[in-house]
Regions:
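Switch/communication elements of ASCE P-loop NTPase nucleotide-binding domains
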Residues: 1-56, 289-355
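P-loop NTPase switch/coupling surface
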Residues: 1-221
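Extended helical coiled-coil dimerization/tether regions that scaffold
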Residues: 197, 201-335, 344
Length: 355
Protein backbone atom coordinates (compact mmCIF):
# COMPACT_ATOMS: atom_id res chain seq x y z
CA UNK A 1 0.00 0.00 0.00
CA UNK A 2 0.95 3.67 -0.14
CA UNK A 3 1.19 4.61 3.53
CA UNK A 4 2.30 8.20 3.10
CA UNK A 5 4.05 10.68 0.87
CA UNK A 6 6.88 13.19 1.02
CA UNK A 7 6.03 16.12 -1.21
CA UNK A 8 7.93 19.29 -1.98
CA UNK A 9 6.63 22.36 -3.82
CA UNK A 10 3.83 20.58 -5.64
CA UNK A 11 0.49 22.29 -6.14
CA UNK A 12 -0.84 23.27 -2.67
CA UNK A 13 2.21 22.04 -0.77
CA UNK A 14 5.03 24.54 -0.29
CA UNK A 15 8.37 23.38 1.04
CA UNK A 16 8.94 19.83 2.31
CA UNK A 17 5.94 18.02 3.79
CA UNK A 18 5.18 14.51 5.00
CA UNK A 19 1.56 13.45 4.48
CA UNK A 20 0.30 10.31 6.26
CA UNK A 21 -2.08 8.61 3.83
CA UNK A 22 -3.02 5.21 5.21
CA UNK A 23 -3.53 3.66 8.62
CA UNK A 24 -5.88 1.03 7.19
CA UNK A 25 -5.02 -1.46 4.46
CA UNK A 26 -8.13 -1.28 2.26
CA UNK A 27 -9.58 2.21 2.49
CA UNK A 28 -8.18 5.63 3.32
CA UNK A 29 -9.94 8.97 3.20
CA UNK A 30 -9.10 12.65 3.54
CA UNK A 31 -11.31 15.17 5.32
CA UNK A 32 -10.78 18.91 5.26
CA UNK A 33 -11.82 22.27 3.91
CA UNK A 34 -11.56 23.19 0.25
CA UNK A 35 -8.06 24.16 -0.81
CA UNK A 36 -6.33 22.34 2.03
CA UNK A 37 -4.56 19.93 -0.35
CA UNK A 38 -6.66 16.75 -0.54
CA UNK A 39 -6.75 16.66 -4.34
CA UNK A 40 -3.08 17.61 -4.50
CA UNK A 41 -2.14 14.34 -2.79
CA UNK A 42 -4.09 12.22 -5.26
CA UNK A 43 -2.80 14.22 -8.22
CA UNK A 44 0.80 13.96 -7.04
CA UNK A 45 0.65 10.17 -6.88
CA UNK A 46 -0.93 10.15 -10.34
CA UNK A 47 1.99 12.23 -11.60
CA UNK A 48 4.47 9.58 -10.45
CA UNK A 49 2.52 6.53 -11.59
CA UNK A 50 1.13 7.76 -14.90
CA UNK A 51 3.80 10.27 -15.94
CA UNK A 52 1.44 13.24 -15.94
CA UNK A 53 2.62 16.84 -16.03
CA UNK A 54 3.83 18.42 -12.80
CA UNK A 55 1.56 20.99 -11.17
CA UNK A 56 4.14 23.11 -9.36
CA UNK A 57 3.55 25.28 -6.32
CA UNK A 58 3.61 29.03 -6.95
CA UNK A 59 7.05 29.38 -5.31
CA UNK A 60 8.54 27.44 -8.23
CA UNK A 61 7.58 30.24 -10.62
CA UNK A 62 9.25 32.78 -8.35
CA UNK A 63 12.37 30.85 -7.38
CA UNK A 64 12.93 28.52 -10.33
CA UNK A 65 13.11 24.75 -10.50
CA UNK A 66 16.75 24.35 -9.50
CA UNK A 67 16.29 26.32 -6.29
CA UNK A 68 12.90 24.95 -5.23
CA UNK A 69 13.61 21.36 -6.41
CA UNK A 70 10.08 19.87 -6.35
CA UNK A 71 9.72 16.15 -5.72
CA UNK A 72 7.09 13.51 -5.01
CA UNK A 73 8.15 10.52 -2.91
CA UNK A 74 5.44 7.96 -2.05
CA UNK A 75 6.02 5.84 1.04
CA UNK A 76 5.25 2.27 -0.03
CA UNK A 77 4.81 -0.72 2.28
CA UNK A 78 5.24 -3.91 0.28
CA UNK A 79 5.74 -7.62 0.90
CA UNK A 80 9.18 -9.21 0.55
CA UNK A 81 7.89 -11.62 -2.09
CA UNK A 82 6.68 -8.68 -4.19
CA UNK A 83 10.28 -8.29 -5.43
CA UNK A 84 12.54 -10.55 -7.43
CA UNK A 85 16.03 -11.50 -6.23
CA UNK A 86 17.71 -8.79 -8.29
CA UNK A 87 15.63 -5.89 -6.96
CA UNK A 88 15.15 -7.07 -3.37
CA UNK A 89 18.58 -5.94 -2.02
CA UNK A 90 17.89 -2.34 -3.08
CA UNK A 91 14.48 -2.46 -1.42
CA UNK A 92 16.05 -3.82 1.78
CA UNK A 93 18.63 -1.01 1.76
CA UNK A 94 15.95 1.70 1.73
CA UNK A 95 13.87 -0.25 4.26
CA UNK A 96 16.89 -0.24 6.59
CA UNK A 97 17.06 3.56 6.43
CA UNK A 98 13.30 4.07 6.80
CA UNK A 99 13.21 1.87 9.91
CA UNK A 100 16.22 3.49 11.58
CA UNK A 101 16.02 7.19 10.72
CA UNK A 102 15.71 9.43 13.78
CA UNK A 103 15.33 13.13 14.47
CA UNK A 104 19.07 13.51 15.07
CA UNK A 105 19.61 12.72 11.38
CA UNK A 106 17.96 16.02 10.43
CA UNK A 107 20.20 18.63 8.83
CA UNK A 108 17.98 21.60 9.76
CA UNK A 109 14.80 22.54 11.64
CA UNK A 110 12.58 21.98 8.60
CA UNK A 111 13.73 18.44 7.92
CA UNK A 112 13.63 17.71 11.66
CA UNK A 113 9.90 18.46 11.72
CA UNK A 114 9.33 16.32 8.61
CA UNK A 115 11.30 13.42 10.10
CA UNK A 116 9.37 13.79 13.36
CA UNK A 117 6.04 13.57 11.51
CA UNK A 118 7.24 10.49 9.67
CA UNK A 119 8.44 8.82 12.87
CA UNK A 120 5.06 9.42 14.55
CA UNK A 121 3.25 7.82 11.62
CA UNK A 122 5.77 4.97 11.49
CA UNK A 123 5.17 4.26 15.19
CA UNK A 124 1.42 4.25 14.64
CA UNK A 125 1.82 1.72 11.84
CA UNK A 126 4.13 -0.45 13.95
CA UNK A 127 1.59 -0.39 16.80
CA UNK A 128 -1.24 -1.51 14.51
CA UNK A 129 0.45 -4.01 12.21
CA UNK A 130 3.17 -6.61 12.19
CA UNK A 131 5.52 -5.12 9.60
CA UNK A 132 8.39 -7.52 10.23
CA UNK A 133 7.76 -9.30 6.91
CA UNK A 134 7.23 -6.09 4.94
CA UNK A 135 9.48 -3.43 3.45
CA UNK A 136 9.18 0.31 4.15
CA UNK A 137 10.06 2.07 0.91
CA UNK A 138 10.09 5.86 0.51
CA UNK A 139 11.10 6.34 -3.12
CA UNK A 140 9.93 8.63 -5.91
CA UNK A 141 11.06 11.24 -8.41
CA UNK A 142 11.98 14.89 -8.61
CA UNK A 143 10.97 17.36 -11.32
CA UNK A 144 13.74 16.03 -13.59
CA UNK A 145 12.41 12.47 -13.27
CA UNK A 146 15.53 11.61 -11.29
CA UNK A 147 15.22 9.30 -8.30
CA UNK A 148 14.43 11.12 -5.06
CA UNK A 149 14.53 9.67 -1.56
CA UNK A 150 13.47 12.93 0.10
CA UNK A 151 14.87 13.16 3.65
CA UNK A 152 16.33 9.65 3.36
CA UNK A 153 19.10 10.72 1.00
CA UNK A 154 22.37 12.36 1.95
CA UNK A 155 23.37 11.76 5.56
CA UNK A 156 20.83 8.99 6.08
CA UNK A 157 21.96 7.05 3.03
CA UNK A 158 25.58 7.38 4.14
CA UNK A 159 24.76 4.75 6.78
CA UNK A 160 25.03 2.08 4.12
CA UNK A 161 27.25 3.72 1.49
CA UNK A 162 30.65 2.29 0.64
CA UNK A 163 29.51 -0.97 2.24
CA UNK A 164 28.30 -4.20 0.78
CA UNK A 165 24.70 -4.13 1.95
CA UNK A 166 23.04 -7.46 1.25
CA UNK A 167 24.84 -7.86 -2.05
CA UNK A 168 24.86 -4.27 -3.34
CA UNK A 169 27.47 -1.55 -3.13
CA UNK A 170 26.52 2.13 -3.06
CA UNK A 171 28.95 4.83 -4.14
CA UNK A 172 29.65 7.64 -1.66
CA UNK A 173 30.51 9.93 -4.58
CA UNK A 174 27.05 9.45 -6.08
CA UNK A 175 25.36 10.04 -2.74
CA UNK A 176 27.29 13.25 -2.12
CA UNK A 177 26.15 14.55 -5.53
CA UNK A 178 22.54 13.48 -4.79
CA UNK A 179 22.66 10.86 -7.53
CA UNK A 180 20.41 7.98 -6.49
CA UNK A 181 20.17 6.39 -9.92
CA UNK A 182 21.25 3.04 -8.44
CA UNK A 183 17.69 2.80 -7.11
CA UNK A 184 16.05 3.55 -10.45
CA UNK A 185 15.32 -0.14 -11.22
CA UNK A 186 13.56 -0.41 -7.85
CA UNK A 187 11.12 2.43 -8.59
CA UNK A 188 10.55 1.18 -12.14
CA UNK A 189 9.79 -2.28 -10.77
CA UNK A 190 7.21 -0.91 -8.32
CA UNK A 191 5.51 1.32 -10.90
CA UNK A 192 5.39 -1.52 -13.43
CA UNK A 193 3.72 -3.95 -11.04
CA UNK A 194 1.29 -1.60 -9.31
CA UNK A 195 -1.47 0.33 -11.07
CA UNK A 196 -2.91 3.66 -9.96
CA UNK A 197 -6.19 5.00 -11.25
CA UNK A 198 -7.10 8.59 -10.35
CA UNK A 199 -10.71 9.70 -10.81
CA UNK A 200 -10.85 13.49 -10.37
CA UNK A 201 -14.03 15.30 -9.35
CA UNK A 202 -14.43 17.01 -12.72
CA UNK A 203 -14.04 13.84 -14.80
CA UNK A 204 -16.29 13.36 -17.84
CA UNK A 205 -18.46 10.45 -16.69
CA UNK A 206 -19.48 9.48 -20.23
CA UNK A 207 -15.92 9.28 -21.54
CA UNK A 208 -14.60 7.56 -18.41
CA UNK A 209 -17.23 4.79 -18.43
CA UNK A 210 -16.82 3.92 -22.12
CA UNK A 211 -15.35 0.45 -22.50
CA UNK A 212 -12.51 1.70 -24.68
CA UNK A 213 -11.38 4.30 -22.11
CA UNK A 214 -8.07 3.65 -20.37
CA UNK A 215 -9.74 3.96 -16.96
CA UNK A 216 -12.35 1.29 -17.62
CA UNK A 217 -9.73 -1.06 -19.06
CA UNK A 218 -7.61 -0.60 -15.92
CA UNK A 219 -10.66 -1.52 -13.83
CA UNK A 220 -11.26 -4.59 -15.99
CA UNK A 221 -7.64 -5.62 -15.60
CA UNK A 222 -7.23 -6.17 -19.33
CA UNK A 223 -7.36 -4.18 -22.53
CA UNK A 224 -9.98 -4.49 -25.24
CA UNK A 225 -7.19 -5.71 -27.52
CA UNK A 226 -6.53 -8.60 -25.11
CA UNK A 227 -10.25 -9.42 -25.02
CA UNK A 228 -10.49 -9.32 -28.83
CA UNK A 229 -7.39 -11.49 -29.01
CA UNK A 230 -9.28 -14.21 -27.17
CA UNK A 231 -12.34 -13.81 -29.38
CA UNK A 232 -10.65 -13.40 -32.77
CA UNK A 233 -7.00 -14.39 -32.47
CA UNK A 234 -4.12 -14.61 -34.92
CA UNK A 235 -5.61 -17.50 -36.91
CA UNK A 236 -8.74 -15.56 -37.87
CA UNK A 237 -6.73 -12.56 -39.05
CA UNK A 238 -4.46 -14.88 -41.07
CA UNK A 239 -7.52 -16.45 -42.70
CA UNK A 240 -8.92 -13.00 -43.55
CA UNK A 241 -5.65 -12.03 -45.24
CA UNK A 242 -5.57 -15.31 -47.14
CA UNK A 243 -9.13 -14.91 -48.44
CA UNK A 244 -8.56 -11.27 -49.40
CA UNK A 245 -5.38 -12.14 -51.30
CA UNK A 246 -7.22 -14.94 -53.10
CA UNK A 247 -9.93 -12.48 -54.11
CA UNK A 248 -7.36 -9.98 -55.44
CA UNK A 249 -5.62 -12.71 -57.44
CA UNK A 250 -8.94 -13.70 -59.03
CA UNK A 251 -9.64 -10.07 -59.95
CA UNK A 252 -6.13 -9.63 -61.37
CA UNK A 253 -6.52 -12.75 -63.51
CA UNK A 254 -9.70 -11.32 -64.99
CA UNK A 255 -8.12 -7.91 -65.62
CA UNK A 256 -5.19 -9.57 -67.45
CA UNK A 257 -2.80 -6.62 -67.75
CA UNK A 258 -3.90 -4.82 -64.59
CA UNK A 259 -3.58 -5.59 -60.91
CA UNK A 260 -4.51 -3.99 -57.58
CA UNK A 261 -1.26 -3.60 -55.62
CA UNK A 262 0.45 -1.41 -53.08
CA UNK A 263 3.18 0.96 -54.40
CA UNK A 264 5.96 -1.20 -52.91
CA UNK A 265 7.01 -4.72 -53.84
CA UNK A 266 5.91 -5.96 -50.44
CA UNK A 267 2.13 -6.24 -50.47
CA UNK A 268 0.61 -5.04 -47.22
CA UNK A 269 -1.46 -7.38 -45.10
CA UNK A 270 -4.05 -6.44 -42.53
CA UNK A 271 -2.46 -6.37 -39.09
CA UNK A 272 -4.20 -7.78 -36.06
CA UNK A 273 -4.04 -4.39 -34.35
CA UNK A 274 -5.79 -2.72 -37.29
CA UNK A 275 -8.63 -5.25 -37.22
CA UNK A 276 -9.08 -4.77 -33.48
CA UNK A 277 -9.08 -0.97 -33.82
CA UNK A 278 -11.80 -1.18 -36.47
CA UNK A 279 -13.92 -3.39 -34.23
CA UNK A 280 -13.44 -1.05 -31.27
CA UNK A 281 -14.44 1.92 -33.43
CA UNK A 282 -17.46 0.22 -35.03
CA UNK A 283 -18.73 -1.83 -32.08
CA UNK A 284 -17.61 -0.36 -28.75
CA UNK A 285 -17.31 3.37 -29.50
CA UNK A 286 -20.99 3.72 -30.40
CA UNK A 287 -22.08 2.24 -27.07
CA UNK A 288 -22.53 4.35 -23.92
CA UNK A 289 -23.26 3.37 -20.35
CA UNK A 290 -26.99 3.34 -19.56
CA UNK A 291 -28.69 2.83 -16.22
CA UNK A 292 -31.55 0.38 -16.17
CA UNK A 293 -34.79 2.12 -15.17
CA UNK A 294 -37.17 -0.76 -15.84
CA UNK A 295 -37.27 -3.97 -17.86
CA UNK A 296 -37.44 -2.07 -21.14
CA UNK A 297 -36.24 1.43 -20.26
CA UNK A 298 -32.62 2.59 -19.99
CA UNK A 299 -31.31 6.07 -19.24
CA UNK A 300 -28.06 7.29 -20.80
CA UNK A 301 -25.44 8.37 -18.27
CA UNK A 302 -25.38 11.92 -19.66
CA UNK A 303 -29.02 12.30 -18.64
CA UNK A 304 -28.36 11.40 -15.00
CA UNK A 305 -27.96 14.00 -12.28
CA UNK A 306 -24.47 14.92 -11.04
CA UNK A 307 -24.88 12.70 -7.98
CA UNK A 308 -26.21 9.82 -10.06
CA UNK A 309 -23.25 10.12 -12.45
CA UNK A 310 -20.85 9.97 -9.51
CA UNK A 311 -22.66 6.92 -8.15
CA UNK A 312 -22.56 5.27 -11.59
CA UNK A 313 -18.77 5.63 -11.71
CA UNK A 314 -18.42 3.99 -8.28
CA UNK A 315 -20.90 1.24 -9.21
CA UNK A 316 -19.02 0.44 -12.42
CA UNK A 317 -15.63 0.49 -10.64
CA UNK A 318 -16.91 -1.77 -7.85
CA UNK A 319 -18.54 -4.25 -10.22
CA UNK A 320 -15.55 -4.55 -12.55
CA UNK A 321 -13.07 -4.90 -9.69
CA UNK A 322 -15.03 -7.52 -7.77
CA UNK A 323 -16.47 -9.50 -10.66
CA UNK A 324 -14.06 -9.14 -13.60
CA UNK A 325 -10.57 -7.99 -12.53
CA UNK A 326 -8.37 -11.03 -11.86
CA UNK A 327 -5.62 -9.25 -9.89
CA UNK A 328 -7.24 -6.31 -8.15
CA UNK A 329 -4.89 -6.32 -5.16
CA UNK A 330 -2.25 -4.54 -7.28
CA UNK A 331 -4.61 -1.72 -8.24
CA UNK A 332 -4.86 1.51 -6.24
CA UNK A 333 -7.92 3.65 -6.95
CA UNK A 334 -8.03 7.30 -5.89
CA UNK A 335 -11.39 9.08 -6.12
CA UNK A 336 -11.70 12.81 -5.53
CA UNK A 337 -14.87 13.65 -3.57
CA UNK A 338 -16.77 10.39 -4.16
CA UNK A 339 -19.71 11.82 -2.20
CA UNK A 340 -19.95 14.90 -4.45
CA UNK A 341 -23.54 15.94 -5.30
CA UNK A 342 -24.97 12.94 -3.43
CA UNK A 343 -27.82 13.20 -0.97
CA UNK A 344 -26.69 12.54 2.60
CA UNK A 345 -28.72 9.32 2.71
CA UNK A 346 -26.75 7.94 -0.26
CA UNK A 347 -23.29 8.75 1.11
CA UNK A 348 -23.09 5.74 3.44
CA UNK A 349 -23.92 3.37 0.59
CA UNK A 350 -21.27 5.04 -1.55
CA UNK A 351 -18.52 4.72 1.07
CA UNK A 352 -19.59 1.18 1.91
CA UNK A 353 -19.11 0.21 -1.74
CA UNK A 354 -15.64 1.77 -1.75
CA UNK A 355 -14.54 -0.18 1.33
Amino acid sequence: MIAGMFIRNFKTYQGINYIPIADLQNLSGFLGNNGIGKSSILEAIDTIFNDNSWNYNIVVKKGGLDKTAPYIVPFFILEYDFFNDEILPYAKAIDHIARNIKEDDATNATTKEVISNFILHRKRLFDRYDLSNKLLLPIGQDYNKSISLSIFGGKSLNMISEANFDGISLSREKIISNDYSDFSPLLSYILDYLEYLYIPKEIDSELFTKLESSGTQVLMGESLHAILDRIIGETTVTDINKELNTFLEEISDKLVNYSYRTPTDRQKKIQKREVYNLIIQAFFSVRKLHRKQSEEQYLEINNLSSGEKQKAIIDVAHALLTKHHQNGEKLIIAIDEPESSLHMSACFEQFNALS
